[in-house]
């Protein structure tokens, strides 16, 4: 048993990546065996759970005239879904939120192309991530003794085929870390963006409500136009270059922007418009492409589709209120912090 004070837990996801998926072939195996059955192609197993969670959230505010859409719907939905999938108690969701915020601190408050935190911020993040590690290790211990139908229990039992062995505590913590950092805020922001887009275009809301088969196309187009993660990676130029008429000197730091690629007019006709008939709707880079495509894209897409089907079952129209003020999270994430809406029930 690894000590809960082992500092190597501090970067559990990075350790897990180095151990379980350091190259392309192992990355594919990791997805295929460890995450695909839960949040990838196998995400459909959670359809009933997501539908129930969605309707319960709507129940909480359906009899009101207004809803703060982020805190009362877009945020708690992926929190509930991911807790159920991983096998964490729902009453611990405030803790998961706290630790999830700690995980993304560099992307929100970090400075420079390396997203560096101050010494104080780094110490705060390390303390919070140590709490997360201790929490997951305790859950892993519980699941080994009393396995349930959840992802942590599965990870304690599975034999990882490339290495023909069981996963270590370190590696399970790393997988759980990836599920939290990748499965909460991104889906939250996507659903909130979609609400804004539908309020801005009420005719589109009517069109989707009348033909629910179009909701999936809308989800893909909204993910393309308003990617929750605008970019992550940076590169340094090794020589002077000109890019679209702009001189880029040697040694310049470039930020790779998925959000910009998604609205490239050379790739997408009328790129800023939602086109439900657009060919190759999933061609955008919001979940990346290739063997490193986001492992949780299946569960995120499912949540978004179910969310809007359930909302349209019960809501005839959403509108902004006189007090609606839209502010976005700083950093590389395109995230709406608050979205006050009024609505008309069916």
Stretches with model-predicted labels:
Residues 1-346:
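Cytochrome P450
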């Amino acid at each position: 048993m690894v000590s809960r004070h082992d500092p190597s837990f501090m970067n559990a996801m990075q350790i897990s990546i180095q151990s379980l998926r350091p190259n392309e072939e192992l990355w594919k195996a990791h997805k295929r065996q460890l995450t695909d059955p839960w949040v990838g192609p196998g995400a459909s197993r959670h359809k009933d759970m997501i539908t129930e969670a969605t309707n319960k959230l709507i129940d909480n505010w359906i009899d009101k005239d207004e809803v703060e859409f982020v805190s009362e719907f877009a945020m708690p939905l992926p929190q509930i879904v991911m807790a159920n999938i991983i096998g964490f108690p729902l009453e611990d969701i405030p803790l998961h939120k706290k630790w999830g915020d700690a995980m993304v601190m560099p992307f929100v408050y970090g400075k420079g192309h390396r997203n560096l935190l101050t010494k104080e911020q780094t110490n705060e993040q390390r303390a919070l991530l140590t709490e997360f590690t201790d929490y997951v290790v305790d859950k892993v211990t519980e699941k080994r003794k009393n396995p349930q139908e959840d992802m942590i229990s599965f990870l304690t039992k599975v034999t990882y085929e490339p290495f023909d062995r069981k996963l270590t505590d370190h590696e399970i913590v790393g997988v759980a870390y990836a599920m939290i950092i990748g499965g909460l805020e991104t889906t939250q922001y996507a659903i909130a963006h979609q609400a804004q887009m539908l309020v801005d275009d009420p005719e589109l809301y009517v069109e989707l409500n009348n033909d629910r088969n179009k909701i999936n196309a809308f989800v893909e187009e909204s993910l393309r136009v308003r990617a929750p993660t605008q970019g992550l990676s940076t590169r340094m130029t090794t020589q002077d270059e000109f890019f679209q008429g702009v001189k880029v000197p040697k040694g310049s730091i470039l930020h790779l922007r998925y959000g910009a690629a998604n609205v490239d007019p050379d790739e997408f006709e009328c790129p800023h418009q939602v086109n439900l008939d657009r060919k190759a709707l999933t061609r955008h880079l919001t979940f990346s492409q290739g063997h490193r495509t986001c492992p949780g894209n299946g569960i995120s897409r499912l949540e978004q589709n179910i969310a809007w089907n359930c909302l349209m079952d019960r809501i005839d129209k959403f509108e902004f209120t006189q007090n609606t003020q839209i502010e976005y999270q700083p950093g590389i994430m395109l995230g709406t912090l608050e979205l006050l809406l009024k609505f008309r029930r069916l």
